[in-house]
């Protein structure tokens, strides 16, 4: 199995798709990497020459923040917003949606499962 940034990328997939298994690399970034290294995006990982793999590895390590470094940076940014008490930091602290979504209904992923309210009855059918 080929490794890029400490991640095993699947051998059977096309290089363009396989690179997206690395945190911080999506389809667009993957296409940019392959264009700059001169590797055909339709090649399967198993068919890649070792020199192509080395080119991709060096490009990713030299030019991109991926995996652990990127995760640490994202967490540091969130922590900083929480500490300075800005609106987004408050939303993170309370476990609510950060990007302006409605919360009257929906937002169950951020808020977690519904909690029953004591004494409140569901409206019955008439």
From Swiss-Prot:
One Pfam match: Ribosomal_S13
Keyword list, A-Z: Ribonucleoprotein, Ribosomal protein, RNA-binding, rRNA-binding, tRNA-binding
GO biological process, one term: translation
Region (Disordered) residue spans: 94-126
Top-level taxon of the source organism: Bacteria
GO MF annotations in UniProt: rRNA binding; structural constituent of ribosome; tRNA binding
Keyword tRNA processing included in the entry's annotation: no
Chain coiled-coil ranges: none
Ranges of Basic residues composition bias in the record: 108-126
GO terms under cellular component: cytosol; small ribosomal subunit
Gene3D superfamilies given in the database record: 1.10.8.50, 30s ribosomal protein s13, domain 2
InterPro entries attached to this UniProt entry: Rbsml_uS13_C (IPR027437), Ribosomal_uS13 (IPR001892), Ribosomal_uS13-like_H2TH (IPR010979), Ribosomal_uS13_bac-type (IPR019980), Ribosomal_uS13_CS (IPR018269)
Similarity-based family: Belongs to the universal ribosomal protein uS13 family.
Assembly behavior: Part of the 30S ribosomal subunit. Forms a loose heterodimer with protein S19. Forms two bridges to the 50S subunit in the 70S ribosome.
Biological role: Located at the top of the head of the 30S subunit, it contacts several helices of the 16S rRNA. In the 70S ribosome it contacts the 23S rRNA (bridge B1a) and protein L5 of the 50S subunit (bridge B1b), connecting the 2 subunits; these bridges are implicated in subunit movement. Contacts the tRNAs in the A and P-sites.
Name this protein carries in UniProt: Small ribosomal subunit protein uS13
Source species of the chain: Streptomyces griseus subsp. griseus (strain JCM 4626 / CBS 651.72 / NBRC 13350 / KCC S-0626 / ISP 5235)
Taxonomic lineage: Bacteria, Bacillati, Actinomycetota, Actinomycetes, Kitasatosporales
């Amino acid at each position: 199995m080929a490794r890029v940034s400490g991640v095993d990328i699947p051998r059977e997939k096309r290089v363009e798709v396989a690179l997206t298994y690395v945190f911080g690399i999506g389809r667009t970034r993957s296409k940019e990497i392959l264009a700059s290294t001169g590797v055909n995006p339709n090649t399967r990982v198993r068919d890649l020459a070792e020199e192509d793999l080395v080119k991709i590895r060096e490009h990713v390590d030299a030019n991109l923040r991926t995996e652990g470094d990127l995760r640490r940076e994202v967490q540091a940014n969130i922590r900083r917003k929480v500490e300075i008490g800005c609106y987004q930091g408050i939303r993170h602290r309370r476990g609510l949606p950060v990007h302006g979504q409605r919360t009257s209904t929906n937002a169950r992923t951020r808020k977690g499962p519904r909690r029953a309210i004591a004494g409140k009855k569901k409206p019955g059918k008439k």
